[in-house]
C-alpha cells in the first residue's frame, strides 16, 4: 500500500477465482487500495455467466483506453471481441473512481469491468474479467490489440511515478528583477522526505542568438 500511496507506484488486480471478493481481500490493505467495494453476500457474488466487453462513457474519453482512431472502428473492434466467462462481481464503485469499461450479461445487465482511481501519489486499477486471455486467442490481430491494451494500461498506471529528487521553479512575486524561487524535494530509498539533504545547484547562463533583421524590426 505504501508503494502506491507514497512511492507513487501502480497496482492492478485481475479477475479470477482468487481475486476480489472471492480472494478474501475485503478489509485488507490491498482491498483498501482497490477502486471498488468488495463487500458482497454469496448470492450477490454469483457469476453472471457469459459477458460482452464494452467501453463505458469515461473510457471513450480516455485515449489510453482506446485502440482505434475513430469511434466506428473502435465499436467494430469491441463487437469483434469474444464473450468472457470468468467475471468477479463487485458491490459498487468507490468515491473518486471511474469506470473505464463495463460488461453486459446475457440478461442485458451492465456491470463494471475496468475501474481506476488515484490512490495517494499513485494509481490503482481493477479488471474484473478473469479470462481476458481469450481475447488474444482469437487471431494474430486480436493478440496485437490485447498487447497494446496492456501497454497503454500499464503506462497509465505508472505515469505519475515521482523521482527521488524533484525540482521546481516559480517567479518571486513583485520582484522587479525577475527572480525565480527554486525548490528541491529529496526523498530517501523509502521515498520519505529528507530534511537535511545537501543539494548542489549549478546555474549556467543561456545566450539567445539574435535573428537577422531583428535590430531594425
Regions found by a protein language model. Give the residues of each.
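N-linked glycosylation sequons
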Residues: 1-217
